Amino acid sequence: MFNRIISLFLLLFTGQVIALDLELTQGINSALPIAINSFGSDAAAQEIGNVIENDLTISGQFKIISGPQGANSQSSVSTLRQLGADSVVTGRVNQVGNRIEVSFTLADAVANGNILLTKTFQINANQVRALAHHISDEVYQKLTGERGIFSTRIAYISVQRAGGRSRYSLEVADADGHNPQSLLVSSEPIMSPSWSPNGKSISYVSFEKKKAEIFTVSVETGQRRLITSFPGINGAPAWSPDGQHLAVVLSKSGTPKIYDVDLSSGSMKQLTFGNSIDTEPRYSPDGRSLLFTSGRGGSPQVYRLSLADGQISRVTFEGNYNARASYTPDMKHIVMLHREDRQFNIGVQNTGGGPISNLTFSGLDESPSVSPNSRLVLYATRYQDRGVLGIVSIDGRIRMRLPAREGDVQEPAWSPYLS
């Protein structure tokens, strides 16, 4: 498995996704009870209500309370309070010329319906889902005090197989998996997507010329830039927090090692040395260190490289396989791929050390990517013999599966905040 991960350029991934459907597999009793009143009967109004419900469910922080008439119905705040709701979102949608006017109110059902938040927006018809995600962010922040992640995006690799041929694509979608767009399509493998800190570009590995090359691509324009194209391995690109550098894995001098590429000048600096294979670099959010996977201790483990003095220290000691590690944005935890008893699951460890706790338990999990608010981990897994995406909370109490309607989905990457 270690060779399979460190030699990313050899992998042939399969999968294709059109949209993702939320399926909650585990929840918590402490979720905040909230009701979403219908925004209206037309398609736009129904979509807004559905998106908000879906978003708040994905967060793991809310329990949706339905009115007497079920979802997408209109009930009084007092009625919804009797059904257990602590908060109520109410809205309306009106046509104003060629624009759509959307208003919403967040009320405290416990405090006699006191208004906590109310806003009105005018949008174009193609902005309905985006506005619904924005409303979810507003509601989430008002009730939790933390910034919402519903207007962020995810990237992933998908492959469609037909007639003995494969079609690889780099997809970008909303955080809930809807609104997928193909940035790149190729008959050769694409892998290792990684978002730039400003969310405007994605780095990735391409085999379109029958060899591994590292590119960046603009999410808005699709314009590409070739970063490295050396003989052998060009893999595992990861952005520095300031967006000025990429850490990459190159084997141009023999054994795969980690290099820093200055994106302005193109100059490179080798960061790791020796005879061991070093791979999967990830910058710390403060830019002071790198996490990476290495076999220098005899088995694949996670190490930390200080960028100030080049000192390397081992991070993981539990088990004989830990890889693909990254910090949560708040730097409180390290999320990784952890193997025990031949089962590959997503694990988490406190940044200061200590035991590794499993967040998932399917034994077929990989490619963890942390949400920008540090609360959720997006990962790839298998379900009913297909590649799908899963989400697990950083404390392991919330687990969700987002099965694709068609094909497989793999190598997800969660964007940073986009505004």
Swiss-Prot record:
Keyword Transferase annotated: no
Record-level GO BP terms: cell division; protein import
Organism: Legionella pneumophila (strain Lens)
Protein name: Tol-Pal system protein TolB
SUPFAM superfamilies for the chain: TolB, N-terminal domain, Tricorn protease N-terminal domain
Protein origin, superkingdom: Bacteria
Main location class: periplasm
GO (cellular component) term, any one: periplasmic space
The keyword Transcription appears for this protein: no
Alphabetic keyword roster: Cell cycle, Cell division, Periplasm, Signal
Gene3D superfamilies, sorted: TolB, C-terminal domain (2.120.10.30), TolB, N-terminal domain (3.40.50.10070)
Listed InterPro entries: 6-blade_b-propeller_TolB-like, PD40, Tol-Pal_TolB, TolB_N
Record's function text: Part of the Tol-Pal system, which plays a role in outer membrane invagination during cell division and is important for maintaining outer membrane integrity.
